[in-house]
């Protein structure tokens, strides 16, 4: 018996099956991309509840818009783009709500648990500092930093996801790295 999803030989075939309501195809998409969507949304939002909400919204959007997948980009790029756009929306909504709130915004600062084996080295304190620093970044800077430095996408892939040019990516990445480094230095986490 083959691996789950083995019969879908391309992203287009997989999304075509999702578009016609194939439950097994949707399960393949969920299995393949749920960890990535959860990880990226959590890294951008620094809030577990918001991340869980965005993750659900991403897969609802994939299901509803599956017939709109045209294959110009890889499925992972399309899903990264949906994830980032929903994160931008959430960050904008968070900013608007904070304007009308008397209390300061509350952000979860707990260290990500079991997001990936590579992240085991992140301590709770370092994660708190990272989240604090990332709040000072624009949504685009957060996304570029997350996609490029934390997810390991190359500049061309980041451009496909964000719609930014290579120069804009470099500029946003430089600003994000500088701000995060300054915050880490302030707390003695980087020399």
Give the role of each language-model region.
Residues 7-11, 97-122:
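Internal acidic/polar
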Residues 68-71, 81-101:
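Arg/Lys-rich amphipathic alpha helix in sigma70-family domain 2
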Residues 144-148:
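A short pre-motif secondary-structure segment
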Residues 19-20, 46-47, 59-74, 94:
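Sigma70-family region 2
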Residues 13-17, 129-137:
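Short amphipathic alpha-helical boundary/capping segments
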Residues 130, 141, 156, 160-186:
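DNA-recognition helix of helix-turn-helix
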Residues 39, 53-60, 73-85:
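Structural recognition of an alpha-helix C-terminal capping motif at a helix-to-coil junction
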């Amino acid at each position: 018996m083959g691996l789950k999803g083995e019969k879908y030989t391309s992203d287009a075939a997989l999304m075509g099956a999702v578009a016609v309501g194939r439950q097994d195809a949707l399960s393949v998409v969920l299995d393949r991309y749920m960890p990535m969507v959860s990880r990226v949304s959590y890294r951008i939002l620094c809030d577990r509840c918001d991340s869980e909400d965005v993750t659900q919204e991403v897969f609802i959007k994939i299901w509803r818009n599956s017939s709109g997948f045209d294959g110009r980009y890889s499925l992972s790029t399309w899903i990264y783009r949906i994830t980032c756009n929903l994160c931008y929306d959430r960050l904008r909504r968070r900013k608007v709500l904070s304007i009308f709130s008397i209390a300061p915004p509350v952000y979860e600062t707990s260290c990500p648990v079991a997001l990936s084996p590579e992240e085991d080295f992140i301590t709770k304190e370092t994660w708190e500092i990272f989240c604090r620093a990332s709040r000072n970044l624009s949504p685009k800077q957060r996304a570029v930093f997350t996609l490029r430095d934390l997810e390991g996408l190359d500049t061309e892939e980041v451009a496909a996801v964000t719609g930014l040019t290579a120069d804009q990516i470099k500029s946003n990445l430089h600003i994000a790295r500088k701000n995060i480094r300054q915050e880490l230095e302030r707390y003695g986490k980087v020399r």
